């Protein structure tokens, strides 16, 4: 039985994303985040999602060549427009910038709007923790769950 190594999983996912039109750097960053989810035991946000992303790219629901556009840029606050791109590489870039700004300013918040699914959020916070920072990541999505005792999805 063939075995899938971490390296080969990243290479294959990167290749599939590139074939769908995603530039190499963004494709590899996305692939690394996806595979990291599986390595962390969060399979619901790992490689099983790749066919969904590829289908959305093919259907035009995700912009393969999206560019982060700066909406607001203050010392401790940056807001990007994600241009309907893949959330993984966009959140990775946002987390890196938040870390850099927090190291200089003591605190920082970076937001990305008009993006897509970004996978497991802990992937973006872990590098912050390794730098001695407190990181918080959150995301929005459609109302799909009822709160306990509720009658309307929030």
What are these regions (language model features)?
Residues 1-20:
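Generic N-terminal amphipathic, Lys/Arg-enriched alpha-helix
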Residues 18-21, 36, 40-43:
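N-terminal and secondary-structure boundary signal
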Residues 22-29, 44-46:
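Flexible, glycine/charged-enriched surface loops at secondary-structure junctions
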Residues 46-101:
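Active-site cofactor/substrate anionic-group-binding motifs, chiefly glycine-
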Residues 70-73, 102-104, 129, 152-154:
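Solvent-exposed alpha-helices and their adjacent loops that cap or buttress functional pockets
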Residues 79-83, 108-113:
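Short glycine-rich or small-residue beta-strand-to-loop segments that form or flank ligand, phosphate
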Residues 109-154:
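Glycine-rich anion/phosphate-binding loop at the beta-strand->alpha-helix junction
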